A protein has these predicted regions:
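PAPS-dependent sulfotransferase catalytic core
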Residues: 1-59, 215-218
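Acidic-histidine catalytic/liganding microenvironments
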Residues: 5-6, 92, 172
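Short beta-strand segments
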Residues: 12, 74-77, 99-101, 179-182, ...
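Short catalytic/ligand-binding loop motif for oxyanion handling, primarily in non-cytosolic enzymes
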Residues: 17-20, 82-84, 105-110, 116, ...
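Short aromatic-enriched loop/helix-cap "lid" or pocket-rim segments at secondary-structure transitions
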Residues: 21-25, 88, 109-114, 119-123, ...
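Glycine-rich phosphate-binding loop used to anchor ATP phosphates in small-molecule kinases
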Residues: 54-84
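Conserved phosphate-donor/acceptor-positioning beta-strand/loop module used by diverse small-molecule
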Residues: 77-78, 88-114
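PAPS-dependent sulfotransferases, especially Golgi type II membrane carbohydrate sulfotransferases
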Residues: 119-125, 129-255
């Protein structure tokens, strides 16, 4: 939705290739540890290569590339970048981070469906992994997930991601973080997108009607869709409760 803001540029999709195709940035270059990248991965050569990789594909909401020398505000929304905040701050000094938060029960239900669908496979030939093809983020400690039921796997995947993200955001100025709750956005999309853009000092001139499903959505979003997986979720939600509480405290501090 934010890609419809004037004077905002995107590369038209997620940035898997724009980053992981560059030498040293694919997980295989780090022993398949995870998708995590740190500030130390951002050498001057890497910074230049990443910026060039993005610049080649930049388009605004009308599909127009930036003019030579035109200042660019880039919108990037690849989930893997949740594990790359320190790296991104080196590549894009002054970066602002939109923290889109969704309740764990809803996220975990969607993740269970994503793993089962086969549409979100990220590393089909992940060394040392067996069972369902690895899907979504490659998180630190993933090797410990072998032989886990999928609900346990996604619970750990989510909690690990959020814990690392919160650790990294602690060093980011609060003025550079813009929180938004998924449920609030679905309930009041116009008000929430205007509030978010105001916080980011972005203009907004679009009247939102009914929101179309994301192109990555498997089934239509509904508040109680998670209940399809209620039985298995009841076993893992208590395990992610400490992370949920930490997120809530963080959001409260941001205001």
């Amino acid at each position: 939705t934010m890609a419809r803001a004037p004077n905002l540029f995107t590369i038209g999709g997620e940035s898997h290739r724009a980053i992981e195709s560059l030498p040293g940035l694919h997980p295989s270059a780090h022993g398949w540890a995870s998708n995590q990248l740190s500030a130390s991965d951002a050498s001057p050569e890497v910074i230049a290569a990443v910026r060039h990789s993005f610049a080649q594909s930049l388009r605004d909401r009308d599909g127009v590339a930036p003019r030579p020398g035109q200042p660019v505000r880039l919108l990037e929304k690849t989930p893997k970048n949740t594990l790359r905040v320190p790296f991104l701050r080196e590549v894009f000094p002054g970066a602002q981070f939109v923290f889109l938060y969704r309740e764990p029960r809803e996220v975990l239900a969607s993740m269970i469906e994503a793993w089962g669908s086969g549409r979100f496979r990220t590393y089909p030939d992940l060394p040392g992994w067996s069972g369902l093809t690895w899907s979504l983020l490659l998180v630190p400690g993933w090797r410990e997930y072998r032989d886990l039921p999928v609900e346990e796997l996604v619970a750990r995947q989510w909690a690990t991601t959020l814990e690392r993200l919160l650790d990294d955001l602690e060093s980011v100025p609060a003025s550079s973080i813009a929180p938004i709750r998924y449920a609030d956005f679905l309930a009041q999309p116009q008000a929430e997108i205007e509030r978010l853009c105001a916080r980011l000092q972005l203009p907004w001139d679009v009247a939102l009607g009914t929101l179309p499903p994301s192109r990555h959505t498997l089934t239509k979003p509904e508040p109680d869709k998670w209940r399809k997986h209620e039985d298995v979720l009841s076993r893992v939600l208590p395990k992610v409760e400490p992370t949920r509480l930490r997120v809530e405290a963080f959001l409260q501090r941001l205001g």
